[in-house]
Amino acid sequence: VNNTIETNKTAATRFIEAFNTDDWDSVREVVAPEYVLHHPMGGTAQLGPEGMVGVWSNFKAALPDSWHPIPVMIAEGDHLAVLLPTYGHFTGDPYHGIPPTGKWLEYGMVNIVRLEGGKVAEGWFGMDPLAEMQQMGAAPSPPPRQLNEIEKENVELFQQTINTAGSEFDNLTAFGDVVIALGPPQHAEDARKRKVDIYRATNGSLELASSHEFTTNPPYAGDPSANTQISRAVVKRFFDDVLIGHDLDALAEIASLDILIHPTAMPCEASYFGINGVGGWLEESWKAFPDLTIADYFTVAQGDIVAVRWAARGTSRGNFLMLPPTGEVVEYTGVSMYRIEGGRIAEIWETRNTLGIMSQLNPEIGGGHHAH
């Protein structure tokens, strides 16, 4: 079994590196003739190798310097899951009718692939096309979260007492008495490491509460000492009791006190922190769709990492991103990745098709047909 997993990881790595280096012949070699892609915007399409080359070469024509590092890659059986950030400048050709803006793009994907005979046979791309459009400058971006006075003071305390070397970060933010430093910046010379440091302020000083580092070459493959079945059971309970059952008491039993959420799967993004932050994040969705449920989900797990592709359904009863309720049922999909620490969820990278939700609430918005 391990030989198959290593063969599959080699094929998947070649597949991604082929995108990074415009090596379309390698794509043709590692993609199965009947390759099927499930994409949040384009639906399901049997592309085969040539179709996949077309999808990726179109994207590279629009963002010539775009690339995917691979911070996390796990495998189980004939399935494999990757955390796949996207970086690049929109300086090339128009992309799906959007003229190039020169903007720097940073957004995340969580992808699950199925391999057959050492070739990529099926792929589920998890990404938020709205985030892609916002990064391209084709849709308005929400304003960044404003720090309160205590949070600003704690960031300043971090800069004065912890970051004495004056290091740069992808993101430096605070939630109450907690400071979160994510880095290094992706333009740094050695961007193969992704580090999350969480500090807690007590009595005027900052103490390190937790620290986690991924290398992107080779990618993190899950902690071999962690029990895969325990990790899977914790995530299953999150889906069954919290996402389906709307039970926030259960969340307190299965989430770390320092749980961190990256809502568009971007490693440098830190939008929700702690059990209260996660509860607030979930309640935003439940206010818009009070009967929101997960209709179906599938997991891939290795060590302390679990990836899940899922389909959600709910009735529009409240505002969603300024769009009024319609009373209609909305359906959407996503792929998420979870890191487990001490039997609790410590980190979530989430992708969901926000643009698809918006286009169902207001068809004039249009779903678009992106295939990256």
Language model segments and positions:
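C-terminal and inter-domain tail/linker signature
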Residues: 1-372
